[in-house]
Amino acid sequence: ATAAASAADAGVVAGDAAPDSPGPLPGAVARYIDHTILKPDATRTQVATICDEAREHVFKSVCVNQAWTRFVNDRLRGSGVLTCTVVGFPLGAAAPAVKAAETRQAIRDGAKEIDMVVNVGALKAGEDELVLADIRAVVEACRDGGAICKVIIETALLTDEEKRRACELSVQARAHFVKTSTGFAKGGATTEDVALMAS
């Protein structure tokens, strides 16, 4: 699903490439990028800079913590760049109802994409029903608000079997995308994890 959606987005600008071009233009690549600022000490000036960079390069979205959602949405208005907000970030340890409420608030504030963190502890404990309920709560809130739901599974904390199960549960819950990591754990995205998740 990720590749298909991204390819469709890239196609908007890919036509500008020369017939013998070795690959996509920078503009096509830009439509794959979620320009992100999630550090706890981010200031209004820093968030504004991220927004302005995203507008300049026509990135896919700007991803921020909940407190900045309305500000980012206002700053990006008319640019074609989407507002993305994280939910249950970075630990994933909130109750499903809390994540759903956070999602609904983010959508009211203008978010078009939600990056939720799965309940990693429940996943590692084999509590699949809880994990499924966790993801579904956010997916349903996204569906009701017309937003995209992406599930962050925090691969650095998982075994390969747990990564597979997290992806399967995300698909079962009808999430739109699955992502590797928050950037706050001991490791981030690897090509091996991406290949495993896509298999």
Predicted segments — roles?
Residues A1-I33:
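Charged, compositionally biased N-terminal leader segments and the immediate start
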Residues D20-H57, S61, A67-S199:
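Alpha/beta enzyme core
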